[in-house]
Amino acid sequence: EKADIVSVKEIAPNSPILSFEVEPEQKIFDDKRVFSGTILNEGVRRADFARVVFYLWDENTNLISSDSAFINGSTIQYSSGIITDCALEPSESASYNVGVAISDTANVKYITKEIHFSIYE
């Protein structure tokens, strides 16, 4: 019965929750921008093949360039035999380093970033 319910607790989803720990460090060169930092898994499940993507935009939000890199995470061997070093366990953090090539005449006005991952057993 509805009247017998004392309380309801929300259960965290059984998934990774990845976030940037701090704003990325950015190094500007003539032909590229290099972003580095760390991400954190605040979820309750491992994130597999985690990578960080950066997008560089001009003043009219036209995409100038983008690139991504896998994180420097934990080494895992999956049941298929594949071995990777870009998994991120719950409560762990990992570093990344992403270089985005641009022309020396590019006028970058906006930068956006995303974290992508997969989930495997």
What is each model feature region?
Residues 46-49, 63-65:
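Short acidic/proline- and small/hydrophobic-mixed sequence motifs that coincide with surface turns
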Residues 1-20, 97-121:
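Terminal connector regions
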Residues 22-27:
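Short beta-strand segments of immunoglobulin-like
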Residues 39-43:
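Asparagine-centered strand-capping/turn motif at beta-strand->loop junctions
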Residues 29-36, 51:
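Short, solvent-exposed loop/turn segments enriched in Ser/Thr/Gly
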Residues 65-110, 119-120:
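Short, solvent-exposed, Trp/other aromatic-anchored flexible loops in extracytoplasmic proteins
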Residues 56-67:
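Short aromatic-acidic-glycine turn motif
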